[in-house]
Amino acid sequence: ANLLEYLICLGFIDLGYSFCHASAFIRKGKTILCPGWRNVGKTNLLLSFLKDGAEFLSDDWVLIDSNGSLFSLPKRINLLHYNYRPNMDTIKKFDPILSVFSDTILQIIEGNKYKYTDLSGTQLKDSLKRRVHFEDLFKRDKVEKSENIDFIFFLNHDNAKDKVSINKCNIKNIKNRMIRILDYEQKPFKLAYDFYKFYTGKSSHLIDSARKINDNVLSEAFRDTSKVFQIDIPDQNQSELIKQHIIRIVGQ
């Protein structure tokens, strides 16, 4: 899957798009982009807004063009074990059997009752991994495109913090961090390419220029976006508090 995502990323960069690790949604006509990576509660935050009626654009990957338009990709919402408890009401409506199964598994995990099963904690958590279509989970259609980006909230995991904090941020800094996330995720493939180039003397103009193209697309896309913030998060269980901060800034 990671290799496929890398190839898809290169394909879209070749077409002039930026392929970004972020969730995105439209709330009351305002498009909100939430870049972030691992253990920041991105999916729980998204689901919380969707339950309130926000329009879905992306859970994980989003396309951005140089005009600042966001495009939804046909990728399902990825549910992990920590997404179930805060969203059990939604999951129950989607699949009552899954809600009963997940509640039982979570009780074992949360109560440290592993003696009642032969499975390890990791195996129990893995048993709750599901990819579901937004349309199936919420019984409504998603939007395919947003014409602009009104707000950017970069979700930053900071173990040194003991509470959620939010501050205005420089757009150039956010753009660079978004690109670094992609660099990190694609590091194994870029390393393999470097070895290939070294031993064969052959190179790919697209791979060599992909980072620069990505930088240029994001610079153009964000040129009119001034409402940019960083939210520092101590752990991934703060989605409701993060939501309150975002609503305070975006407006009721």
Language-model-detected regions and their locations in the chain:
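Conserved lysine of the Walker
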Residues: 42
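Extreme N-terminal, non-catalytic leader segments
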Residues: 1-31
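Gly/Ser/Thr-rich loops at beta-strand to alpha-helix junctions
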Residues: 39
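Glycine-rich, often acidic-flanked micro-motifs
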Residues: 21-36, 51-252
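Post-Walker A alpha-helix
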Residues: 45-46
